[in-house]
C-alpha cells in the first residue's frame, strides 16, 4: 500500500550547496511557507569536495556537515534523508519517492547532484572496486587504503588524483591510468599538468596517460587489468574515478527537458511549470551563450540562490550571469588553480611566466579589448573568486596588465576595493 501523500509549498530534491542556498534565498522573502527537503543521502548535508580529506584523515567525518538539525528547525524545513526521488509527475505537481510516498508541491527545485559514471569495461561487474561520491564511499575507501599495497586508479581528474596522493602517502604502489594524453584534462593546461605529473612521479607514483583498459578480471588479491597495448596490471585496490553523471533517471516521462543536464533558463526554471533546477542544471555558459554543465561548488551556490529567489517570487532576483569554470587543487604541498576559459578569443593575447626555481607558473588570457577571459597557475597566489568577477564584469585590464600579470592577487584585490561597492 502507498504511504501517505505529503503537501508542501516548496519541495527541494537534494541537500548540498545548491539546495542550502535555495533555502536561504526562499526564507529571505518567505519566512513561513513550508519547505520539504528530500535526499537520497543518509546523512546531514555535506560537500562532496571535502571527501578526499575524509579519506586522508585530515577531516573527521563528524566535522564535515554543512548544517545541523537546528538549522532545519530554525528555518521550518522538514528534512527527509534516505528519500530518493523516483519519479516526477510535473503535470500534477507531484514527486514520487523511492520509499513509496509522494509529495505534492507548489514549487520544486531539482538539485539532485550526480553519481559516478562507470565505464563499460568488459569484466567490470566481476571485480570489486571503489568510487568516491558519498561520505559512505569515503569511509569505505579510507579503511581500504590502510591495507593496500598495490593500487590502480582509473581516471586522472581531481577525485582520482586526490585519492592517488592519499594512496602514495600511505605507502602503496600506485598506478594512475588515464585515457587522455595528460593528467587533469579539462582542468589545467599541458604545462600545469606536466608539473602535477612530475610531483606524482617524484613521490613514487606511476602514470600511464593515453591508456585504455580493455578488460578486467578478478584475482585472489583483487583485480587484473589489461590495457589496449597488452600491458597488464595487478591491483589489491581499484578506484574508478572516471567522472560523474547527473542524477536524472527520475525525469523519464516527466516533461522536463534534459540533455547533459536539466535544461534551464536564466532564472533556473526548467521547461516544466513550477519546476526549477540548480547544480544538476545545464545553463547558459558565460563565454558561448550555449547551455553547458558547470559542476563546481561556486556555481552550484549561485544557481541555488537564483532558483530560490525565483521560486519565492523575490523581486530582487537577477538573471544568472553564466557559467565560469573555477577549479582549485592541492597536491604534495603545492597548489593549482584555473579560472575561466582556456580558449584564446579572436585577437586575444596569452601572457605566461614560469620560474623554474620556485616552480611558479602563470598563464593569463586576455580578450582583444582588454578583459581577462582565463587565468591558470601552479604555486601562484590569486583569489579565484576575484578573478571570476573580473571575467564576469568584463573589466578592462589594459592599463594594469603588466602589474596584474606580475601580481594578480594584489592587483585583483585593488580593483575590487576601488570599483566593487
Curated annotation (Swiss-Prot):
FAD binds at residues 15-18, 39-40, 279-297. Its EC number is 1.2.1.58. One of its GO terms (molecular function) is phenylglyoxylate dehydrogenase (acylating) activity. Transmembrane segments: none annotated. Its cofactor is FAD. It catalyses: phenylglyoxylate + NAD(+) + CoA = benzoyl-CoA + CO2 + NADH. Belongs to the FAD-dependent oxidoreductase family. This is NADH-dependent phenylglyoxylate dehydrogenase subunit epsilon.
Amino acid at each position: 500500500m502507498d504511504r501517505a501523500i505529503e503537501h508542501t509549498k516548496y519541495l527541494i530534491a537534494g541537500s548540498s550547496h545548491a539546495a542550502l542556498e535555495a533555502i536561504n534565498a526562499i526564507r529571505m522573502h518567505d519566512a513561513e511557507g513550508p519547505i520539504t527537503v528530500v535526499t537520497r543521502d543518509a546523512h546531514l548535508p555535506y560537500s562532496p569536495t571535502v571527501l578526499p580529506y575524509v579519506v586522508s584523515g585530515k577531516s573527521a567525518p563528524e566535522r564535515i556537515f554543512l548544517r545541523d538539525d537546528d538549522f532545519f528547525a530554525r528555518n521550518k524545513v522538514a528534512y527527509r534523508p534516505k528519500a530518493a526521488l523516483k519519479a516526477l509527475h510535473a503535470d500534477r505537481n507531484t514527486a514520487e519517492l523511492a520509499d513509496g510516498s509522494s509529495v505534492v508541491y507548489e514549487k520544486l527545485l531539482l538539485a539532485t547532484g550526480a553519481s559516478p559514471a562507470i565505464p563499460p569495461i568488459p569484466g567490470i561487474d566481476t571485480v570489486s572496486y571503489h568510487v568516491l561520491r558519498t561520505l559512505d564511499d569515503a569511509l569505505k575507501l579510507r579503511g581500504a587504503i590502510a591495507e593496500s599495497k598495490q593500487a590502480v586508479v582509473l581516471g586522472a581528474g581531481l577525485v582520482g588524483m586526490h585519492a592517488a596522493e592519499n594512496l602514495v602517502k600511505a605507502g602503496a604502489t600506485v598506478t594512475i591510468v588515464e585515457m587522455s594524453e595528460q593528467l587533469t584534462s579539462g582542468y589545467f593546461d599541458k604545462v600545469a599538468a606536466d608539473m602535477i605529473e612530475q610531483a606524482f612521479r617524484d613521490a613514487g607514483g606511476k602514470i600511464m596517460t593515453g591508456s585504455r583498459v580493455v578488460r578486467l578480471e578478478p584475482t585472489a588479491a583483487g583485480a587484473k587489468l589489461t590495457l589496449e597495448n597488452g600491458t597488464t596490471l595487478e591491483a589489491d585496490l581499484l578506484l574508478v574515478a572516471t567522472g560523474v553523471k547527473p542524477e536524472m533517471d527520475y525525469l523519464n516521462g516527466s516533461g522536463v527537458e534534459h540533455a547533459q543536464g536539466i535544461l534551464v533558463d536564466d532564472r533556473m526554471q526548467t521547461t516544466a511549470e513550477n519546476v526549477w533546477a540548480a547544480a544538476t542544471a545545464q545553463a547558459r555558459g558565460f563565454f558561448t551563450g550555449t547551455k553547458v554543465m558547470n559542476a563546481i561548488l561556486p556555481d552550484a551556490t549561485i544557481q541555488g540562490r537564483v532558483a530560490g529567489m525565483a521560486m519565492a517570487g523575490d523581486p530582487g532576483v537577477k538573471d544568472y550571469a553564466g557559467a565560469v569554470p573555477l577549479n582549485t587543487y592541492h597536491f604534495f604541498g603545492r597548489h593549482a588553480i584555473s579560472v575561466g576559459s582556456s580558449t584564446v578569443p579572436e585577437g586575444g593575447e596569452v601572457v605566461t611566466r614560469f620560474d623554474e626555481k620556485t616552480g611558479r607558473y602563470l598563464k593569463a588570457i586576455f580578450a582583444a579589448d582588454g578583459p581577462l577571459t582565463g587565468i591558470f597557475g601552479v604555486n601562484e597566489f590569486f583569489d579565484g573568486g576575484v578573478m571570476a568577477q573580473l571575467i564576469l564584469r568584463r573589466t578592462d585590464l589594459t592599463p594594469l596588465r603588466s602589474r596584474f600579470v606580475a601580481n594578480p592577487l594584489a592587483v585583483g584585490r585593488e580593483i575590487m576595493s576601488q570599483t566593487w561597492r
